[in-house]
């Protein structure tokens, strides 16, 4: 029961993140750090009372070192590398084009993460629908499909799968969700197409037309060499799950070697290798990419 009660601050923090930007956006913008501190203290203080300061410190450090650190480094790497790739084109935001774009982005999310796919595709999606007035549904489905649902096939895609992988779940285990993903993707695409087609007809009836500079389809991708760095990040994540099983990374008792932070909390050598590879990939991405690309991405 006590363990369940200690979950309340986490649920409260998630609700704040989801609701406050909509209800009190200005307050949230200024005080989100304070909200995180308050909810964290609402966990830490009762935990100290129930379990003692030592166990609470160990629990908090375990979460920071073995969960949060590698997770945030992965997001940082995907965000940086994806920000150095730009997708340009003269596509017009019709229902069919938007649906195909959403389908592509949904499948891409499991390859470069929901963060990476969203970073790469949100600007082209906004640009090709900039001529339209009735378009709120486009970004809603973008968030549903590309920023959330699409990452369900690999630990690269979604944070919960990454944490499962860090706890020993096989990297490709979640591929069995592929039929479910396809079913839901098709269902959502049908719903989206019907809604978008109705709104599209309203825009056309109001005299709105896409501004396409030249006939045909002209799509240009810059910064493609960054795919190498995305692959490096994927390899780093896979290594973090496979290296701990190698004898060279274990002591005589079979424990994974690393730097002890506090009691049983340890930053393992495989985790350090993963972090180093991801940070190196992000650094090389910045060093080898023209700044113009980042400017185009508003990055």
Can you describe what each PLM-predicted range is?
Residues 1-6, 27-35, 56-69, 171-180, ...:
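Interfacial loop-to-helix junctions that mark the boundaries of transmembrane helices
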Residues 9-20, 39-50, 75-83, 182-194, ...:
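Hydrophobic core segments of alpha-helical transmembrane domains in multi-pass membrane transport
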Residues 15-28, 78-93, 126-129, 192-198, ...:
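C-terminal ends of transmembrane helices
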Residues 25, 44-67, 76-94, 107-120:
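Transmembrane alpha-helix boundary signature
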Residues 29-40, 65, 69, 91-103, ...:
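Cytoplasmic-side transmembrane-helix entry/capping segments in multi-pass membrane proteins
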Residues 96-150:
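Hydrophobic transmembrane alpha-helices that form the pore/transport pathway of multi-pass ion
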Residues 134, 153-154, 172-221:
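Juxtamembrane and boundary regions of transmembrane helices in multi-pass small-molecule transporters
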Residues 230-299:
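Transmembrane helical segments that form the transport core of multi-pass membrane transport proteins
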């Amino acid at each position: 029961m006590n363990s369940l009660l200690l979950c309340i601050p986490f649920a409260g923090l998630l609700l704040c993140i989801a609701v406050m930007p909509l209800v009190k956006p200005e307050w949230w913008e200024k005080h989100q750090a304070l909200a995180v501190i308050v909810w964290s203290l609402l966990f830490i203080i009762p935990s100290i009372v129930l379990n003692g300061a030592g166990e609470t410190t160990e629990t908090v450090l375990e979460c920071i070192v073995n969960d949060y650190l590698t997770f945030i480094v992965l997001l940082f790497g995907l965000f940086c590398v994806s920000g150095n790739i730009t997708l340009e084109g003269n596509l017009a935001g019709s229902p069919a084009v938007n649906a195909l774009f959403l389908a592509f982005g949904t499948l891409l999310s499991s390859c470069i993460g929901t963060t990476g796919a969203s970073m790469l595709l949100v600007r082209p999606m906004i640009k090709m629908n900039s001529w339209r007035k009735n378009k709120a549904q486009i970004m809603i489905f973008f968030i549903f499909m590309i920023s959330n649902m699409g990452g369900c096939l690999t630990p690269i895609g979604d944070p919960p799968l990454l944490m499962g992988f860090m706890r020993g779940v096989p990297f490709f285990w979640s591929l069995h969700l592929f039929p479910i993903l396809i079913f839901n993707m098709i269902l959502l695409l049908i719903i989206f197409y019907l809604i978008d087609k109705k709104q599209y007809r309203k825009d056309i009836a109001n005299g709105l037309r896409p501004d396409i500079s030249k006939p045909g389809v002209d799509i240009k991708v810059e910064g493609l060499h960054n795919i190498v760095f995305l692959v490096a990040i994927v390899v780093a994540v896979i290594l973090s799950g496979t290296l701990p099983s190698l004898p060279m990374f274990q002591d005589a008792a079979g424990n994974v070697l690393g730097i002890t932070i506090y009691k049983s909390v340890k930053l393992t050598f495989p985790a350090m290798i993963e972090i180093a590879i991801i940070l190196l990939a992000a650094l090389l991405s910045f060093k080898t990419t023209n700044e113009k690309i980042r400017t185009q991405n508003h990055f």
